[in-house]
Amino acid sequence: MIQYLTHNQIDKKKWDATITECGNIYAYSWYLDMVHPHWEALVEDDYQAVMPITGGKKFGVNYLYQPYFVQQLGVFSKQPLTQEKTESFLKAIPSKYRFAEIRLNESITFDKEVQGIEYHRNVLLDLNQDYESIRANYHQNTKRNLAKAESNNLQLVTTVIPYHVVALFTDNRGALLDKWGDAEYARLTALGKVAVQRNSAFILGVTEKGVGLLLCAAIFMKTANRITFLFSGLRQEGKDRQAMTYLLDQVIQQNAGQPITFDFEGSDDENLARFYLGFGGNEVKYPSYTFNRLSPAGKAVLKVWKGRK
């Protein structure tokens, strides 16, 4: 039987035991506490299968949404997931939620069409082979860019903190975007700090040897069998020197030969996907789920609100 639990009713020790078997960093209780402090849950059979509920309220309407800095959530199970099991959880979402736009995870598959399901792209690279074999599978353009990077006197630095990564982003590409505000960047910085303290993340940057200017930097989340490229910053000088190609190659090189998957965390953006696929990874699809139970008037208000986002 699937139960709906409020935040205070969740046994986080049991919850995390289930998530550990699934290897998804985003669904750990501490991670959810950082990105959505009052998350709730659907739980079946003493945490044999679980699903986080990340809800909000606008104009008096309860709705579900995907928190920032979380690519995949959905149903997690100690046993292989079936479509029937997934659908039973989706049907168990409390009726108070009138609208939802949430992303599920790559272990969830649908053999037949389900209303509200769409698919998104991720790129994964198996690191359980020697580095030379991995590099041999890089696309030609990636090999050229890496050769250019290696001729640019670059070096890896480990003295980077979350604030440096966020600032590098906000001062460059982030200055052209209005997707996130100060609260979101503060949350990301705090998330990075907590993850590093928990040994669930590492942060690396790239500079030119003898020059202190940070060309690029990134936050990488990690579990026992997965490294996730969560967030990065890159300045124009770094782009010109192929610093990000160098950084990702260094992480791949350091972790090659281990039973680890490198998760590029995206992307539906064609240019980013091409860049990530250039490292020889495989495209993996994961689903999202949308429903709309609003009245006609509510749907009209929602349309206006989404148009302002």
Q: In which residue ranges do the predicted regions lie?
A:
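Short low-complexity, flexible loop/linker segments enriched in glycine and/or proline
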Residues: G116-I117, R173-G174, F279, K299-L302
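Aromatic (often tryptophan-rich) hydrophobic motifs at membrane interfaces
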Residues: E84-K91, K193, R198-A300
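A conserved beta-strand-loop-helix scaffold within acyl/acetyltransferase catalytic domains
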Residues: I2-D46, V50-G60, L104-K239
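Short, solvent-exposed beta-strand edge segments and adjacent coil->beta transition regions
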Residues: V70-Q72, S151-N153, P259
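A gly/proline- and charged-residue-enriched helix-loop-helix capping module
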Residues: Q66-S107
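Short, high-confidence coil segments that cap the C-terminus of an alpha-helix
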Residues: P37-W39, S95-F99, G257-P259
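Short, hydrophobic beta-strand segments that form beta-sheet elements in well-ordered domains
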Residues: A41-V43, R98-L104, F262-F264
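Membrane-proximal basic amphipathic "stem/tether" segments
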Residues: M1, N292-K309
